[in-house]
């Protein structure tokens, strides 16, 4: 992996022509350019995605991994919640961020929200806005998520 992308982070996609794509959003876009059976690209919102991939991720990391950063996790939880309130407002009259069907923005953003919810599930259930919780529940219980998150047995070197 390091030979393909010196960043040393996942995911990394190496195309047949040798091109390397090492950003999640770019990999999603590439895959959907190949095949987009549910029309997710129709709801592609670069500004919203950039906010969650940068500002929200910043707060998520400092909330989830507070000991690593030495910062007040509650301040970052509050900042993250403020951003989630904006998503909740978008979800007030529709089931998904782009309308009544899931799309690119939903699939790209919900893993961050899922991680945020997982830091303190009881707090999230009590404090996160209702529309947002419903949206997260719909995505977590979706067929797409369940297929992607099948638990596999741990691979060991003995299996070579």
Q: What is each PLM-predicted segment?
A:
Residues 1-82, 88, 92:
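GST-like domain detector, emphasizing the conserved glutathione-binding G-site
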Residues 32-36, 68, 92, 112-113, ...:
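Hydrophobic/aromatic-lined pockets within catalytic cores
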Residues 37-39, 122-128:
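Structural helix-adjacent loops and short alpha-helical linkers that scaffold large soluble proteins
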Residues 66, 70-75, 95-98, 125-127, ...:
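Residues lining hydrophobic/aromatic ligand-binding pockets adjacent to catalytic sites
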Residues 75-83, 127-141:
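Extended, well-ordered alpha-helical scaffold segments
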Residues 89-100, 144-148:
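Surface-exposed helix-capping loop/turn segments at secondary-structure junctions
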Residues 97-122:
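GST superfamily/GST-like fold recognition
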Residues 147, 151-160:
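Long, charge-rich low-complexity segments
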């Amino acid at each position: 992996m390091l030979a393909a992308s010196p960043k040393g982070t996942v995911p990394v996609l190496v195309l047949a022509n040798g091109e390397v794509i090492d950003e999640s959003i770019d990999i999603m876009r590439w895959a959907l350019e190949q095949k987009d059976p549910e029309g997710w690209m129709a709801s592609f919102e670069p500004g919203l995605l950039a906010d969650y991939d940068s500002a929200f991720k910043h707060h998520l990391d400092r909330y989830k991994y507070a000991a690593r950063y030495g910062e007040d996790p509650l301040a970052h939880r509050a900042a993250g919640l403020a951003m989630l309130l904006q998503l909740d407002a978008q979800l007030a009259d529709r089931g998904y961020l782009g309308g009544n069907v899931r799309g690119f923005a939903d699939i790209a953003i919900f893993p961050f929200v899922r991680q945020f919810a997982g830091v303190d599930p009881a707090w999230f259930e009590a404090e996160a806005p209702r529309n947002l919780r419903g949206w997260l529940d719909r995505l977590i219980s979706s067929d797409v998520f369940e297929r992607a998150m099948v638990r596999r047995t741990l691979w060991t070197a003995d299996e070579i």
